């Protein structure tokens, strides 16, 4: 499945504005590059792409800008003359505007600052892609990893169990008052027990989920019913890694995978009646003129298994890991795009595809998790992925055409009505707790509505 071309019939100039987090390298950078390419190839000449990307510091903003402008120039050079935009108004073509902005999803004051800046501009966001995140690993169990590579390569690289998690990672204090109180304690030699403690926030949970969740709420004034909120998940978003009693993954044996399971639960249940109250609270939508206001839609995607720096390997081990990933693809694994650009296809598909291709498809066949899959020779496409408890489309036993039914997690169980009901119950509870956490932290940050 690829992004369809839109008609050239509409001549009124319009701007498609998309925000991508964590774009300085890896998947985030690849998503930005692919957005540029597919926008220029599929959208009419009357449309302009305003690509907003985030990084955590000014140097990365500048470096990413250079990379993206170089990519844009390369793409323009390859385009046929009829698709090549005029260069009279802006370097690199007037159909693409590239802008970098700062945010650190693990620092809530920067999340609020970003939202304040964008809302102040009043420019609608057509899509956001929540990609930024951290792994929370502290090393590799090399013996276990090598044994898995030698005996079960495809499975070991699709559902790895050899990364050593750093259990219990806690984010730095978020409120200025708490930070200044701690400083005053040091200066005045006051007993730390007299300083009110700030509730802990799981570092991985904050960077991967909650920072984006709050940003979604703060940016809600810029969303229209046609806007799209695209979450990036993982093939490793599996039930054993998540416990609803440990929402933030502070006790989880794999906080990264736990955070991605949270992502799946949030997105897949976002259109159910049981979560409607909480979703409307997040998006600030109630009733308008006696009618329930329409909401932007949430989508969830995953890039398959790609080679990025998130694992923190040195160059030597990184090379052999790359060899292993390609070998897994050559052994017919469907989930090894390897190249981040190929892995970006699912996120870009969810951001750019016309309404009749994606929204209507989910309305007919059910809500799905869209993954980046490849053939043996690397030809990439977008396909539905099974989500434990939800299935492929929210209907037990139904597998829509084009879904990937190989490379499955070995702990899976066949879909059932009970499993589907349990997934919804867990999702509704998760939404309730996320909304409670959001309101708590808005109060702590002095941002209550």
Task: State where each predicted segment sits.
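NAD(P)H-dependent oxidoreductase Rossmann-fold/reductase module
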Residues: 1-107, 113, 117-126, 135, ...
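Amphipathic alpha-helical repeat scaffolds
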Residues: 24, 131, 205-208
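Glycine-rich NAD(P)-binding loop of the Rossmann-fold in SDR/ketoreductase-type enzymes
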Residues: 106, 203-211, 258
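A short helix-coil junction within the Rossmann-fold of NAD(P)-dependent oxidoreductases
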Residues: 122, 135-139, 218-226
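Active-site loop of short-chain dehydrogenase/reductase
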Residues: 125, 165-184, 201, 222-235, ...
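Conserved NAD(P)H cofactor-binding loop of Rossmann-fold oxidoreductase domains
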Residues: 131-189
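Substrate-binding pocket helix/loop in short-chain dehydrogenase/reductase
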Residues: 140, 200-201
């Amino acid at each position: 499945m690829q992004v369809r071309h839109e008609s050239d019939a509409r001549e009124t100039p319009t701007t498609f504005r998309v925000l991508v987090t964590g774009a300085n390298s890896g998947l985030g950078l690849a998503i930005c590059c692919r957005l540029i390419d597919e926008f220029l190839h599929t959208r009419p000449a009357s449309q302009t792409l305003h690509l907003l990307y985030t990084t955590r510091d000014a140097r990365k903003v500048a470096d990413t800008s250079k990379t993206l402008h170089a990519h844009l120039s390369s793409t323009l050079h390859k385009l046929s003359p009829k698709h090549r935009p005029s260069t009279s108004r802006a370097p690199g073509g007037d159909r693409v505007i590239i802008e970098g902005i700062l945010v650190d999803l693990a620092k809530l004051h920067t999340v609020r600052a970003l939202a304040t800046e964008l809302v102040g501009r009043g420019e609608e966001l057509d899509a956001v892609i929540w990609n930024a995140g951290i792994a929370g690993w502290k090393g590799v169990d090399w013996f276990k990893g090598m044994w898995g590579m030698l005996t079960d390569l495809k499975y070991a690289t699709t559902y790895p169990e050899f990364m050593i998690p750093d259990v219990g990672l806690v984010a730095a204090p978020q409120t200025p008052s708490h930070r200044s109180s701690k400083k005053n304690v040091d200066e005045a030699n006051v007993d730390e027990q007299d300083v009110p403690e700030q509730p802990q926030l799981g570092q991985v949970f904050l960077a991967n989920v909650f920072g984006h969740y709050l940003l979604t709420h703060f940016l809600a004034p810029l969303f229209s019913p046609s806007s799209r909120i695209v979450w990036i998940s993982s093939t490793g978003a599996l039930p054993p890694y998540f416990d609803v009693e440990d929402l933030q993954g502070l006790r989880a044996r794999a906080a990264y995978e736990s955070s991605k399971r949270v992502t799946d639960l949030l997105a897949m249940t976002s259109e159910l009646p049981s979560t409607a109250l909480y979703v409307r609270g997040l998006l600030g939508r109630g009733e308008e003129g006696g009618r329930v206001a329409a909401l932007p839609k949430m989508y969830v995607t995953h890039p398959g298994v790609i080679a990025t720096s998130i694992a923190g390997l040195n160059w030597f081990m990184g090379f052999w890991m790359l060899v292993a990933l390609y070998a897994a693809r050559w052994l017919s694994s469907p989930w090894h795009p390897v190249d981040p650009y190929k892995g970006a296809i699912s996120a870009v598909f969810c951001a750019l595809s016309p309404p009749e291709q994606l929204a209507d498809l989910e309305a007919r066949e059910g809500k799905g998790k869209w993954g980046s899959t490849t053939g043996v020779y690397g030809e990439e496409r977008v396909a539905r992925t099974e989500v434990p408890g939800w299935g492929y489309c929210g209907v037990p036993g139904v597998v829509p055409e084009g879904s990937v039914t190989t490379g499955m997690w070995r702990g899976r169980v066949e879909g059932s009505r009970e499993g589907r009901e349990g997934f919804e119950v867990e999702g509704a509870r998760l939404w309730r707790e996320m909304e409670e956490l959001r309101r708590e932290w808005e109060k702590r940050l002095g941002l209550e509505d």
